[in-house]
C-alpha cells in the first residue's frame, strides 16, 4: 500500500471515532480532506446521522458542502471532536500547524473540541518542533514590517510568506510570517512572547491539544497517544 493510500486509511481510522449526533471540527489540508470525504460518505450511506460540521477554512467549508455535510459557524458551544492534519508532530503530540494558512481558524475551532484527532504521514514526526518546518505566525497587514521587526528581536531570520508579487493572504485577510524556531526553547513561553507582540494574531503552535494521532508510515498506520 502506498503512502497516499495509507493517509486515506489514517483518515478512516479517525472518522471511525465520530458518532451520530456529534458536532465535528473539519480540518484543512490534503490529509484532512480525506476525513471530510469519508464523513460525507458515511452520512450518505446512513452509517452516521445528525452530524454537523464546523469548518476551519473556506476550502473545508466548500468541500463539506460538496460531500453533503451540514455545516454551521463556530459558536461558544463545544465540539465533540475535531479532525485535522499537522505540519510537525512532537513525541508529546505538541504540534506545528498552519503551513496551509488556516492556523487561526483551526486553533479557534479545535480549542473548543473535546477531542482533537490528528492525521498525518510519518514525515511529519519530529523530535522537536521546528526541526523540519517553520512556525507560521499570522499578523495583521497594517504595519506588518514593524511587527516582523519586533518578532525578529527574539526570532532571528524567517520571512513573510509571499508566493508571488504580493504577500499571501489568509481567509481572515491577514499575512503570515514564517519564523525559524531555535534549536532549544520553552514552547509555552515562546508562544506567550509571540502572542504578546503587537500586530500578532496567533501562532501555529498547538500545545497540549491533540489527544491522539493516526500516522501513515511505510509499515502501516500507527496510532500515537498523548
From Swiss-Prot:
Keywords: Isomerase
Binding site for substrate: 28-31, 84-87, 97-100, 124
Functional pathway: Carbohydrate degradation; pentose phosphate pathway; D-ribose 5-phosphate from D-ribulose 5-phosphate (non-oxidative stage): step 1/1
GO biological process, one term: pentose-phosphate shunt, non-oxidative branch
Entry GO MF terms: ribose-5-phosphate isomerase activity
Keyword hit for Calcium: no
SUPFAM superfamilies tied to this protein: D-ribose-5-phosphate isomerase (RpiA), lid domain, NagB/RpiA/CoA transferase-like
Listed CDD domains: RPI_A
Function, as annotated: Catalyzes the reversible conversion of ribose-5-phosphate to ribulose 5-phosphate.
Subunit comment: Homodimer.
Designated name of the protein: Ribose-5-phosphate isomerase A
Organism: Deinococcus radiodurans (strain ATCC 13939 / DSM 20539 / JCM 16871 / CCUG 27074 / LMG 4051 / NBRC 15346 / NCIMB 9279 / VKM B-1422 / R1)
Gene name per UniProt: rpiA
